[in-house]
């Protein structure tokens, strides 16, 4: 958009408000969206482009939701965080033998529970985790049908940190805050550490996980060395990329736990240093200019993508408007380097510090600058404000007085935000708020920014690159055919460079009180992704029908493994698990029976599912 009025609209959104990547932290975050007076503080928009929307009762409930958050959600959240911390410390003090013994006993309980299931009478297998606990945008409607519960709540221990093999063996409910608290003092870390403390290993593997180091190591699941899985028949198997269960190993990511129950994972560790040297680079121009500045920040134009001298350890971008963005690159630095005279150390983890996305935005005024951030604080830089969703949850949460007095209780626990809302509120958020990640080839990032601006008008946008590897098997997500021949900027012979365009916040029309079709916007986005070989992480609300779902993702290897390992008829298929809306037991059972009786439809030839030579 190039006119004067759109330019004012872009400037009005510059105050920076954004939502959590990947994650569905924002189901309760529209507490400010219905306050027209609050909009004026963020926007001087004029002449709305769409008809005004009539208010409904939910608008008024959401308008004052911050009261519930401050007096109920935040205190309970802090208490739960503290109790969880005490439990984690207790676990860490146990010996390896104790943790291993507990793990083996808990696995036996899972096997025994599975064997109690009567396939003719009981529903499909689901975990006993309550729907509101999951850190995701979906309503988890599949658990509203009759189902057979298996309790995995005991699987939250770090079993072992093996410094010789550089492997962390962990259980699925171990979260990012827990594992960095253990590994960072050892100058070790997972190769990919998702930003938010509450994100669990199981969710990042079975679903989707990304971080600023993914342009080197790929998605979170790409850093896993082995999975320990309980199959439908109760067998416990260890799947690696080169053993007899290699097909299962490559199928687990993105499967949403529909092939078996993950009970532990062995994940790659890397050596790190005490600080992150972070460079903030502002960029101005149109969206194509911003896209190229982002690409140039971490991809050498000579194609030398594997050269650590030319490629930073961490990359992140934030597009604050259609004309402004800030791109950050980080490199690990020693304590000695950070404390040299003249260097600036910024401990962003203190509760009273400015929220990170707002701090980064200052580069637009003061120009490029460099600072050193303690490594663990850098990893979790977006936790306290949930990217920029904190601004919607608590409209005054970024003010110094609030940060100083109550910032130590932030963030509100996502599970409690979800637990304190009903179905009508959840559906309201689905229509009035966008929480989506668009994974697209890096060379199309400019087109993606253009698309989001025209269809949703959401700012800020979060940019994070990741490698999409070419595997021996064709997995649910895979690179474009022939990418290695084109060798576009960022690509290598073994991986195509993709990027996440994180779209989290209330769209411009909603902020202006105009009519907005949230479901329609998501459908348009999904069609655009399919046409551009992109992917939609399944934590988000999806409008895809089954045919379109399997146009976006590849079904071949997944369905073969479902049948081979007995998951059909025991675990719900990934489409039905991610499908929007309530599923009846009859609907799910009929779908499962159809898979048992008919061959796989509309998938690639069998040779695509065999190991490459």
Kindly give the residue locations of the regions a language model identified.
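Noncatalytic alpha-helical scaffold of FAD-dependent oxidoreductases
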Residues: 2-613
């Amino acid at each position: 958009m190039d006119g004067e009025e759109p330019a004012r609209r872009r400037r009005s959104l510059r105050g920076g408000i954004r939502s959590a990547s990947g994650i569905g932290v924002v189901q309760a975050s529209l507490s400010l969206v219905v306050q027209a007076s609050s909009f004026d503080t963020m926007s001087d928009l004029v002449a709305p482009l769409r008809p005004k929307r009539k208010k409904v009762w939910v608008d008024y409930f959401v308008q004052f939701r911050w009261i519930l958050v401050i007096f109920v959600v935040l205190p309970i959240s802090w208490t739960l965080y503290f109790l969880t911390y005490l439990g984690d410390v207790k676990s860490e003090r146990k010996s390896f033998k104790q943790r291993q013994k507990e793990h083996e006993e808990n696995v036996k309980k899972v096997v025994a529970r599975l064997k109690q299931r009567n396939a003719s009478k009981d529903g499909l297998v689901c975990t006993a985790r309550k729907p509101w606990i999951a850190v995701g945008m979906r309503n988890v409607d599949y658990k509203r049908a009759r189902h057979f519960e298996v309790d995995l709540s005991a699987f939250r221990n770090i079993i072992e940190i093996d410094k010789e093999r550089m492997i962390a063996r962990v259980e699925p409910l171990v979260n990012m805050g827990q594992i960095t608290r253990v590994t960072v003092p050892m100058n070790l870390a997972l190769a990919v550490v998702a930003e938010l403390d509450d994100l669990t290993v199981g969710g990042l593997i079975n679903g989707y996980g990304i971080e600023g180091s993914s342009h080197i190591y790929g998605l979170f699941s790409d850093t896993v060395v082995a999975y320990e899985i309980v199959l439908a028949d109760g067998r416990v198997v260890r799947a690696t990329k080169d053993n007899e269960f290699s097909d299962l190993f490559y199928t687990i990511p993105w499967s949403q736990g529909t092939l078996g129950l993950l009970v532990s994972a062995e994940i790659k560790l890397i050596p790190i240093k005490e600080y992150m040297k972070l460079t903030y680079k502002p960029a101005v121009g149109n969206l194509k200019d911003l896209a190229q500045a982002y690409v140039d920040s971490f991809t050498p134009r000579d194609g030398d993508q594997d050269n650590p001298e030319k490629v930073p350890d961490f990359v992140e971008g934030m597009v604050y408007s259609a004309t402004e963005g800030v791109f950050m690159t980080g490199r690990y630095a020693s304590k000695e380097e950070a404390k040299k005279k003249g260097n600036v150390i910024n401990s962003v983890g203190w509760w009273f510090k400015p929220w990170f996305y707002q701090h980064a935005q200052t580069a637009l005024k003061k120009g490029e600058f460099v600072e050193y951030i303690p490594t663990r604080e850098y990893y979790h830089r977006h936790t306290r404000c949930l990217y920029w969703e904190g601004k919607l949850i608590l409209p005054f949460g970024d003010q110094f007085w609030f940060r100083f007095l109550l910032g130590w209780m932030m963030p509100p626990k996502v599970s409690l935000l979800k637990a304190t809302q009903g179905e009508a509120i959840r559906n309201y958020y689905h229509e009035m708020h966008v929480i989506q990640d668009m994974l697209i080839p890096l060379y199309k990032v400019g087109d993606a920014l253009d698309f989001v601006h025209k269809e949703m008008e959401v700012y800020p946008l979060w940019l994070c690159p990741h490698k999409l590897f070419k595997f021996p098997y064709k997995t649910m997500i895979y690179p474009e055919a022939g990418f290695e021949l084109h060798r576009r900027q960022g690509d290598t012979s073994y991986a195509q460079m993709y990027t996440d365009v994180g779209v989290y916040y209330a769209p411009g029309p909603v902020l202006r009180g105009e009519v907005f079709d949230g479901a329609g916007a998501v459908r348009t986005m999904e069609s655009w992704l399919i046409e551009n070989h992109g992917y939609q992480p399944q934590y988000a609300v999806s409008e895809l029908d089954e045919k379109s779902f399997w146009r976006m993702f590849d079904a071949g290897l997944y369905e073969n493994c479902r049948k081979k390992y007995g998951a059909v008829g025991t675990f719900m298929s990934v489409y039905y698990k991610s499908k929007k809306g309530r599923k009846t037991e009859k609907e799910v059972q009929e779908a499962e029976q159809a898979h048992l009786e008919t061959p796989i439809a509309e998938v690639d030839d069998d040779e695509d599912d065999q190991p490459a030579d």
